[in-house]
Amino acid sequence: MMGDHLRPMECLNICLEDNLQPCPEAYPSEIHGHPGPSEPCQEHTCPFDPPESARPDAPHGNSGVESTHLENCLVQVQARQASASLRSLEDNSSLGSPQQNQSSSTQVVFWAGILQAQMCVLDLEEELEKTEGLRAELRCCIPPPSKDLLGDEGLSPSRPEEDEDSGDDSSGPEEENQTWPREKIPGSSLEWGAEEDSIFFDNPLFLESPCSDTSTEGECFSWGYPNSHPDMKTWHQSPQTLDSPLQKGTGLWRQENELDLGSDTADHGGCSTPPFPVPSYKMHPCLALGSTEGDPTVPPDQEGETSCEDDLGHGSPKAPFVDHELIQESDNFEFDLRPATTHPVQPWGSQTSQSLSDLTQPILEDLQREDPSRSQETLISQNRGERDAGCFQEPVFCTLAPWGSQTSLLEPNCPESEGRGSGPQPSPVSSQDSSPRVLLHSPKWPQDASHLLQKDRSELSSLKEEETEEVPSLRQEAECEDTSRSEDASANQHHVHLASAEGLPESPMPQAQSPEEGWRPSSSREKLANDIRNDKGAWNLALRLYQLNGFRKSEVAAHLRKNNDFSRAVAEAYLSFFQFEGQSLDRALRGFLQALVLSGETQERERILYQFSKRFHYCNPGAFPSVDSVHTLTCAIMLLNTDLHGQNIGKSMSCQEFVTNLNGLQDGRNFPKELLKALYWSIRSEKLEWAIDEEDADRPEKDQPSPSAGKISSPFLQMAQDPTMPTYKQGILARKMHHIADGKKTPWGKRGWKMFHTLLRGMVLYFLKGEGQWLDGESLVGHMVDEPVGVHHSLASPATHYTKKPHVFQLRTADWRLYLFQAPTAKEMASWIARINLAAATHSAPPFPAAVGSQRRFVRPILPMSPVQSSLEEQHRSHENCLDAASDDLLDLQRNLPERRGRSRELEEYRLRKEYLEHEKTRYETYVQLLVARLHFPLGDLALWEDQLGKETDGSQEPRPSLKKSHSSPSLHQEEAPTTAKVKRNISERRTYRKIIPKRNRNQL
């Protein structure tokens, strides 16, 4: 058994060292005692070592021993090549694939050697994976590698995790067959053993995949070769079984990559002489380029350096270092190689990395210029000197989709979607039928492929940053788009080919567009600076805006008013959905303003109105001579609506002014006067209504912002929308404004009496038109004819000083305005007084603290107008505290009278302060009295409360026995005594009640 293993090793070492090449004319029938055509090599492996002369530290005394097996080895290799070539011819003829260069016998011999070598390396891979004990023994025998060999990450120590995985399928008999010591093998050395150990034991391609499932045999793809191979005996007879030795024979490409990588790059760079002959192995150019993908030192433009590196000779210590580094970098790529007669479309294009195409593009262009038909060949060279002559398939950009699925055939990168020159191409049906032969797949491979792809990409990302920084991001983007497509491969084959061929020089990842995305720009860079897109996108957005699909009415104008071509296209498409045929301009404008909320700046609104004018002129071409005339009149209508119904103060625009302002604006002529008058009275009688969102219309009234009532703008309008505010009283009242704010006299033109239907709701008096009864919670917007009046912190009392009209009461507001109201009867007057004061006492918030400063001028404080949320008890306590404070302030003021000879300003300040404090004291006294009466009837009717209040008032007005002032002061006349509250007075206060007053102070106090 030991001899069987030593003879192939010795044979290869002799061949590699002496540069001997076999003669292709001999055809022995057996190798190592196994029948060639029927039984694959499963037990005997042939590891191929690099020549001893290729290492500077190799011994030089082994040539005599190795030459003893030279003749036998050459005969065996030639025999296997002959048998494999015969089987290849039979398979090609049975599959019916096109035959290229059929008369070339050297080509047949070459392919036979390739296939037979694959079988040998597969056997070697299986035996090495199953023999964990052998590896442990070998590691013990191998000394540590030198530092020059470990200077790069390519020569890394073995990983124990992979060793454990690879040792799961080991068997006892096979371990015994291969437990020969490495030192006893002729032609080998410790240095080569370390390198072999790193290649075969640490290389993940020779171990089981970490994502594969080894529990079920034959269902999951494995990096190792299975224990049993029932189909390998007849693999040359079936097109399906032909894939097994090729798909799983990844070890062949790894071994050859280690042996021949330096010469491959040299061959591409222009050197056609191989460093040493290996007759039965041929490296594919894509693998050579793929292996150098991650290495920035061997790009296509630096192939000359690699050639010079090979020319240094095999004695250079750099050769094994570079080869091993490239092998480690190429561990993430696999290729499925078949004879050219089986598939004219080569399968490895779908698995080649994106950067492979970038590296090989200059080579492809040169090869295509020499012979376009070479793009169909599948590497038909018979020796290394012919590698530049044979043209491999043009690598296409690709990303790995789940293998074995139809999705992978739909990619723009798939080889079956690419044109292959003038050679025959398979039909769409045959392309789909042959997909199992094109792609390496198994029932559980899709998950493993995605996992390994991510792992490989992460390992190569650090090596690609200097050359291809954008490749990983584009590859990920392509993967996201590629996995979402599931269209028919036959329908997209020609289209994808064109997209891939045209996009090659510009984008590293051209994508096939779906029919839904055909109108969209292929990349964001194709958009202009002002976001121009095509008409299809503008029309789709306009349709969504018109149908309010995902938009509200208040959001439509934002997409129509921008100053760019796309926004104008959207606005034009949006207006195309409106039909204005036979409508007047004001009617069309009203309908348009009901569809959207016209918002934005003046120039933004003008852009939207211009699109409206274009559409109106298109629908009514005979109404106006041009679009500009329609646009001018539309803007004039908008300004007229603002002037007549806006919040402006002053005289409104008349019809004559409206006509005069538009003179000469209809393309140099005047608009018809009848048209302008009709538009004026239409807007004056009915203002333009603005659209509101449906959400705002459905929510409660208190949440809605209240629109303005005519020219009035008052914060009390918001209180009119609150349905929680109770209605205290309503009826007909005549009103007269006696003083405006701050107690100033009302101008002459505004002193007249006016009749209103007055409504007291909450703490606001509303003056409405009509005499109907208003219910609680009913909206008052649109029915008010004058500004509402707030009664917070106000006091209503009978107007005893006014004698011109009966039943008149006065209302002093918080801003010191004074209103006179006339009620129909005295009872109505008393009811209005009581209920206004009750509303003020219930809803008036406590005043803010007084300001602190050095200014001695008296200024009335500003009282809060927001309604309070406190209960009646809390309000009662608050008003009592305010009453005590006002009483104390008034007492302090009376104790500190100004000097008799003081200036007039000081006396005026004293008068204003005293008047204010007396009013505040009276107001809080009234509030406390009303709240006490209200607390007795918290839930009762206000009519019962009024009756009880009236009884208390009548009882308080009855005369009570008391001393008259004339008794204490006989000199004072009883009729001239002032009616003031009895308080404790000092001497200075008695001066105001004496009849004899100094002349200088009579008119000032």
Swiss-Prot record:
Main localisation: membrane
Residue stretches of biased makeup (Basic and acidic residues): 453-465, 476-488
Residue runs in coiled coils: 870-926
Chain ranges of the PH domain: 726-841
Compositionally skewed regions (Basic residues) per UniProt: 992-1005
Record organism: Mus musculus (Mouse)
Protein name per Swiss-Prot or TrEMBL: PH and SEC7 domain-containing protein 4
GO molecular function: guanyl-nucleotide exchange factor activity; lipid binding
PROSITE patterns: PH_DOMAIN, SEC7
